[in-house]
Each structure stands twice: as structure tokens, then as C-alpha cells.
């Protein structure tokens, strides 16, 4: 974008120039892309509700667990094992937890009658000893239950362990009971109350419907909106067995997903429940499998404080609430439409890729000559020429050369390094199509002798014999009319150029060269055409006419204005023009790069 230099530059608008190609194949490709993209954009707009402004849910959760369990516990009293029956209600097997979680006890181990005194440690690899030297007074092992006294005492039979100051007797290391003591907790139910709020949309609701049947139980298909869940059903949904998990405990996630459409015409805001096991199922390889913790019941007996230590195994239920609430918003709709408009450009990118590929030199040289089916693709070269304009960087070394006996133009973009320009190969570029509209503006003198149909001047010229080489003609001259350059030695190679690549007649002998380049009447007409009030005095007439003749030849032989700016005139043409419109002092500066 050009810089603004004045106030009028502010009130401008720029747009791209496009090329319209009338092609059944490319038209079909374009509409195929547009239909696919339009279908996808509409589908995503409706299915994902991308026209809505969405807001994350804010929620609070409250739970109530109900159920009664009968526990058969085996205890040892006076050396005799007894089976004790007890009943556990909600207060016995639930524990208060922070956040959106609740805990249900399913198994436990008891150590009764503990009091603070000295006693031997429970025998383990760490606590076994044979003498007092194996125990360190005051040592507190993180895995131990107390502080060592430095004595090694008898635990039972021949086993000796370090004596500790702790709650005695020390808790035994033993496995959780199998089956779980509260195996009937599978039939417990939990009521989940979930209130949600979307403050941005000023909308609040909850998961309990107004006419809820309090005797309902959640079922994935038959009763998916019931907020009362049976614990065994939760594990069944995840593919786990409640009885197996109840032995050592675990962690279960209850997911509540709210996908709320708050638009009046499609209002819907109901929760969707799902379940996920959150702890490690592979208890055999876990370092600490399951879920457990300890708590104590304190009491006094004979004025001595005692406690019953209980190691609790159970299931922690984490309630995870997430979701969004969306409502129609015109800004979101405009943003979405604007972001998808660029997708329609994929058709242009793909078609441009096909045109560029099928018009490449590789296809032209290696594919089209051998593949008959691919020959219709040659039309892409025409499309490419109409679509793209190749521009060469205007370096000081850029030069264009045109030989009358070649159909193409040669581009030389390198330093000559003393070599004659006639001998430099260069790169072949197509000759631009001639625009004959400007010829209609020339004076009628140019058309004095009507050409013979089918026999252009240049074709007649190539059939003539070469002009005999003069004694002054350089070795690189092919037409016999070139003269040595007057430039210094370092720049002389730039003017060592003939109008022909191979021996033949000189272009200066053609009738068209005389009428178009050397005709003083035509050149004066062109100068006045550009500047109607131009005063052609005697001193500047030859200079203006000479440079106008240079430009006429360059435009005639090179066609493109860009090429004409970097065109090098053959020595024969340059000296013929200089002879017709000479310089008074006879010294000429030669070619100068316009950039």
C-alpha cells in the first residue's frame, strides 16, 4: 500500500485485478469446492452452535447417602473367636469431605484398647532385632508406630522387636478382610443435588426436576434424569465389580455435563450423567492400592485415656461438574462467518496450483510429448500467460537482445567480463505479441507501398543474400554493416552485437526499417504526438530524433515496454541511425541502464 502524501490519498480504494477463465473443468472444480465448504460451514454452524456466545458453568453440589448395612465381625475375646453382628447406618459409614466429594466405608480393620505406654513393635523386617544394639534410643522411623527406647524385647515366642513408646498394642500389619465387611453397600443410594448458574446469561437451574419421583433410581436409558444413584449401578456402568473394589477401596468419578441451549426457540438445559474410574485398577502392581485412611474413637477406662484405631477402606466419589451455556449473539455469528470466508479461497488455490503445474517446463518437456491424454492440458500455458506477468529484477546487468533470424528474444542477466555480447547465449524468452493499435496513429506515409499479402518485409529479407563484409566490419558481425564501438575498452563489449545470429542480410536494408525508424516525418509526428507544442529547433532536432529512432526500433523489435527499456540495439542499426541523425561532435555515450 503506498504511503499517504496528501489528504486526497486518504480517500482512495485499491482492488485486485482478476482474470476470468471460461472453462467447464475449472468451473466444475470451483463449484465442487464451494458446495463442500458451504455444506461444512453450515453443518458446523448448526451442530456446534457457533452462532452462540458460550459461558462456562458455575455449580455447587450437595449429596445425601442412604442405606443400612449389617456387619458380621469376627473378634477374639479371652482367646475365643466370636462372631459379632452390628448394624451400620449413614453416620457410621460416611465421612465429611471437602469439595464435591463424599466417602462410603466398605471395609475396615480394628485395633481396640490402645493406650500410651511401652510395648514391643509389631514384627517386620525393619523392627526385628536380636539385642539392644539393634535398637537406637530416641529413633523415630517414619514407618514405625512410636519412638524407640533402645531395648530389644520379646514380642511373641522367639521373636524379638525393638521396644517403642506408642499407642499399645501396636496395630498389626494384615490384609483387608475378604469379602468386604460392608459388601451390602452396593445397594446404598446417593442423592446428588446440583445447582448451576450462568451469570453472563442470567440463568440458574438445578438437576432436580419439579415433579421428581423420590422413589426413582437412575438408569442410563429408562430414567436418565433421576439424581438418585445406586452405588452398585455406578460401578456396573464402568465395567467394574463393586464387591472387588470394596475390599481395598477406590476412587470413582461422577461426571455431570451441562450442554445448555438458552435460545428461546430451542431451549434445552438438562444434565447428562456419566461415570469414570479415577484410581489405578491394577492393584497387583500399585504401590498403595485402593483407598484407605485411619481414624480413632477415644474413650476413658479407669481414668485412663484409650482409643480404638480403625483403618477404613472405602470408595471416594468425586463429582465433576462441567459444561457450557450458549445463547444467540450476532457478534459471534458475524465473527464465525468472517473466519470461514477464507475457506472459499481454497478453490482458487487449488486451480492456480493446477494451472502452474500443467504449464511448467517439466510437463511441457517430459509429459506432453509422450502422454496423449495429457495434451489437452497444454491450454493451461495460455491461462498462465493471461494470469501471470513475469517481471525480471531490473539489475544493472540486465539486457535484452533480438536477432532478426530468431523468433525469440534473448535475456542476458550477467556481467560480460570482456566477452562480446554477440557470443553470450543468454536465456530464451517468448517474443511478446505485437499490439498494432499504435500503428494506426502513424502518418499515412508509412503505408505508401502496400505490402504483398503473405510476403512480409522481414521474410523477404531473410531470403536475400548477405551484404558483402566491409573491410571495417568486426569479426563478430554477421550482416556486414556493423562498425567498431567508440566506447572505452571496459564497456566496448556491450555494443559488440549484430542484428543477426547467423550470416545474412542486414535489417537496415529492409523497407520497414527505413519507414519506421529512419523516416524523419514519422519521427517528428511521434514527437509532436507526445508533446503537441514541441519546438524542434535546429540544435536539438537531431538529438531528439535520434533517441526517438532508438525507441522506435526497440518497441518494434521487442514489443514489451519493459523489454524495450533494457534493449541493446545492434551495432549496424545504431550506426545507421547515428548516420541519419548525427551528433555534431561525433561522440556517443552508448547504452545506459534506466535503473
From Swiss-Prot:
<feature type="site" description="Selectivity filter 2">
    <location>
        <position position="14"/>
    </location>
</feature>
<dbReference type="GO" id="GO:0043029">
    <property type="term" value="P:T cell homeostasis"/>
</dbReference>
<dbReference type="InterPro" id="IPR003050">
    <property type="entry name" value="P2X7_purinoceptor"/>
</dbReference>
<feature type="glycosylation site" description="N-linked (GlcNAc...) asparagine">
    <location>
        <position position="202"/>
    </location>
</feature>
<dbReference type="GO" id="GO:0006509">
    <property type="term" value="P:membrane protein ectodomain proteolysis"/>
</dbReference>
<feature type="glycosylation site" description="N-linked (GlcNAc...) asparagine">
    <location>
        <position position="241"/>
    </location>
</feature>
<dbReference type="GO" id="GO:0042098">
    <property type="term" value="P:T cell proliferation"/>
</dbReference>
<dbReference type="GO" id="GO:0051899">
    <property type="term" value="P:membrane depolarization"/>
</dbReference>
<dbReference type="GO" id="GO:0060907">
    <property type="term" value="P:positive regulation of macrophage cytokine production"/>
</dbReference>
<dbReference type="GO" id="GO:0009410">
    <property type="term" value="P:response to xenobiotic stimulus"/>
</dbReference>
<dbReference type="GO" id="GO:0033198">
    <property type="term" value="P:response to ATP"/>
</dbReference>
<dbReference type="GO" id="GO:0032308">
    <property type="term" value="P:positive regulation of prostaglandin secretion"/>
</dbReference>
<feature type="lipid moiety-binding region" description="S-palmitoyl cysteine">
    <location>
        <position position="374"/>
    </location>
</feature>
<dbReference type="GO" id="GO:0014054">
    <property type="term" value="P:positive regulation of gamma-aminobutyric acid secretion"/>
</dbReference>
<dbReference type="GO" id="GO:0051901">
    <property type="term" value="P:positive regulation of mitochondrial depolarization"/>
</dbReference>
<feature type="binding site">
    <location>
        <position position="294"/>
    </location>
    <ligand>
        <name>ATP</name>
    </ligand>
</feature>
<dbReference type="GO" id="GO:0071359">
    <property type="term" value="P:cellular response to dsRNA"/>
</dbReference>
<dbReference type="GO" id="GO:0030501">
    <property type="term" value="P:positive regulation of bone mineralization"/>
</dbReference>
<dbReference type="GO" id="GO:0005524">
    <property type="term" value="F:ATP binding"/>
</dbReference>
<feature type="lipid moiety-binding region" description="S-palmitoyl cysteine">
    <location>
        <position position="4"/>
    </location>
</feature>
<dbReference type="GO" id="GO:0035590">
    <property type="term" value="P:purinergic nucleotide receptor signaling pathway"/>
</dbReference>
<dbReference type="GO" id="GO:0032731">
    <property type="term" value="P:positive regulation of interleukin-1 beta production"/>
</dbReference>
<dbReference type="GO" id="GO:0019233">
    <property type="term" value="P:sensory perception of pain"/>
</dbReference>
<feature type="transmembrane region" description="Helical; Name=1">
    <location>
        <begin position="23"/>
        <end position="46"/>
    </location>
</feature>
<dbReference type="GO" id="GO:0043025">
    <property type="term" value="C:neuronal cell body"/>
</dbReference>
<feature type="glycosylation site" description="N-linked (GlcNAc...) asparagine">
    <location>
        <position position="284"/>
    </location>
</feature>
<dbReference type="GO" id="GO:0016485">
    <property type="term" value="P:protein processing"/>
</dbReference>
<dbReference type="InterPro" id="IPR053792">
    <property type="entry name" value="P2X_RECEPTOR_CS"/>
</dbReference>
<dbReference type="GO" id="GO:0031594">
    <property type="term" value="C:neuromuscular junction"/>
</dbReference>
<dbReference type="GO" id="GO:0016020">
    <property type="term" value="C:membrane"/>
</dbReference>
<feature type="transmembrane region" description="Helical; Name=2">
    <location>
        <begin position="329"/>
        <end position="353"/>
    </location>
</feature>
<dbReference type="GO" id="GO:0034767">
    <property type="term" value="P:positive regulation of monoatomic ion transmembrane transport"/>
</dbReference>
<dbReference type="GO" id="GO:0043409">
    <property type="term" value="P:negative regulation of MAPK cascade"/>
</dbReference>
<keyword id="KW-1003">Cell membrane</keyword>
<dbReference type="GO" id="GO:0032496">
    <property type="term" value="P:response to lipopolysaccharide"/>
</dbReference>
<keyword id="KW-1015">Disulfide bond</keyword>
<feature type="site" description="Selectivity filter 2">
    <location>
        <position position="352"/>
    </location>
</feature>
<dbReference type="GO" id="GO:0006954">
    <property type="term" value="P:inflammatory response"/>
</dbReference>
<feature type="binding site">
    <location>
        <position position="572"/>
    </location>
    <ligand>
        <name>Zn(2+)</name>
    </ligand>
</feature>
<dbReference type="GO" id="GO:0034405">
    <property type="term" value="P:response to fluid shear stress"/>
</dbReference>
<dbReference type="GO" id="GO:1904172">
    <property type="term" value="P:positive regulation of bleb assembly"/>
</dbReference>
<keyword id="KW-1133">Transmembrane helix</keyword>
